[in-house]
Amino acid sequence: MKLTCMMIVAVLFLTAWTFATADDSGNGLENLFSNAHHQMKNPEASKLNKRWCKQSGEMCNLLDQNCCDGYCIVLVCT
């Protein structure tokens, strides 16, 4: 019983240690915020201005509702 408890504690500790010391090589949020700040200063170079949505008559995704102006009905933007 003690061995089982020790094993459970060890696994939990190692899991927590792995998440706490994981290296974010892409520097995720920091990189995202600096890019967004740069794009606000230079809106012509901004990728945020490019629309990801679908125009009327194009195929769409029912779950995301990715139509620009209307709604996604039967997988086609209206």
Curated annotation (Swiss-Prot):
InterPro entries, per database record: Conotoxin (IPR004214), Conotoxin_d-typ_CS (IPR012322)
UniProt keywords, alphabetically: Cleavage on pair of basic residues, Disulfide bond, Ion channel impairing toxin, Knottin, Neurotoxin, Oxidation, Secreted, Signal, Toxin, Voltage-gated sodium channel impairing toxin
Signal peptide limits: 1-22
Function per UniProt: Delta-conotoxins bind to site 6 of voltage-gated sodium channels (Nav) and inhibit the inactivation process. Binding of this toxin is strongly calcium-dependent but not voltage-dependent. The binding site is most likely on the extracellular side of the sodium channel. Binds receptor sites on both mollusk and rat central nervous system, but despite its high affinity binding to rat sodium channel, it has no functional effect in vivo and in vitro on it. Also has no effect on Gambusia fish. Is important in mollusk for the paralysis of the prey.
Pfam families hit by this protein: Conotoxin (PF02950)
Subcellular location: Secreted
Propeptide: 23-49
SUPFAM superfamilies xrefs: omega toxin-like
Domain free text: The presence of a 'disulfide through disulfide knot' structurally defines this protein as a knottin. The cysteine framework is VI/VII (C-C-CC-C-C).
Family in the record: Belongs to the conotoxin O1 superfamily.
Protein name, per record: Delta-conotoxin TxVIA
Misc note: Veratridine increases the rate of dissociation in a dose-dependent manner.
Bridged cysteine pairs (disulfide): C53-C68, C60-C72, C67-C77
Natural source organism: Conus textile (Cloth-of-gold cone)
Tissue distribution of the protein: Expressed by the venom duct. Is present in all duct parts with a highest content in part 4 (distal part near the pharynx).
Lineage: superkingdom: Eukaryota
KW Signal (keyword) present: yes
